[in-house]
A protein has these predicted regions:
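C-terminal interaction segments
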Residues: 1-20, 122-181
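Acidic, aliphatic-rich amphipathic alpha-helical segments
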Residues: 10-110, 163-164, 169-181
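Glycine/small-residue-rich hydrophobic helix-like segments
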Residues: 96-135
Length: 181
């Protein structure tokens, strides 16, 4: 089965027209599961092969979040929390470590590795911290906002000599590029 990261990369390359039939099929499957007509599978077939159902649903949600960001549609708080957690999980799986901590209160925090040599943090407040609100993180993680724009506009607070390396780790899913932005 494909990892969350592999599925995310494939979805990043898809257009909304490519994803619509798959989303429709997934919604039908979810409806069948919720009405009890068939047992819920642990894995589903995706465009890139089999994946865990929960991972696939989370990435489908991320695609919906990206469409909302591109359209300027306000998202419910619960959706923002889930989207932040999912994107932070992918970021942690891709760049996990103990040098930089990215905080997105109240949704999540993730510890990341420096792209250069950096201190290995174990307890207490780490020396390299970046913190943003959920909207800013979603925009950064999906490519609708660059790191430099976020810094210039005071939308992210940072401390430590390695925290600027986060710019190299973002976006997690470049949906803005796919939307022509």
């Amino acid at each position: 089965a494909h990892t969350l990261i592999e599925v995310a990369r494939q979805i990043e390359e898809d257009s909304p027209e490519d994803l619509l039939p798959q989303a429709s099929s997934l919604l039908s499957t979810v409806e069948e599961r919720l009405t009890g007509t068939r047992p819920t599978p642990a894995r589903v077939e995706t465009l890139v092969g089999p994946a865990r159902l929960t991972d696939h649903l989370r990435l489908t949600m991320i695609d919906g979040v990206c469409m909302a960001l591109a359209s300027g549609i306000a998202l419910p708080r619960a959706v923002k929390v889930d989207a932040c957690r999912t994107l932070a999980t992918i970021l942690g799986q891709t760049h996990g470590g103990r040098t930089i901590e990215l905080r997105v209160p109240p949704a999540t925090a993730v510890q990341l590795e420096s792209t250069t040599a950096g201190p290995d943090h174990h307890r207490g407040t780490p020396p390299n911290v970046a913190e943003s609100d959920m909207e800013t993180f979603l925009a950064l993680a999906t490519g609708f906002l660059s790191w430099s724009q976020a810094r210039e506009n005071g939308r992210i607070s940072t401390s430590g000599s390695h925290v600027e390396e986060l710019a190299e780790m973002l976006p997690v899913v470049d949906a803005a590029h796919r939307c022509g932005r």
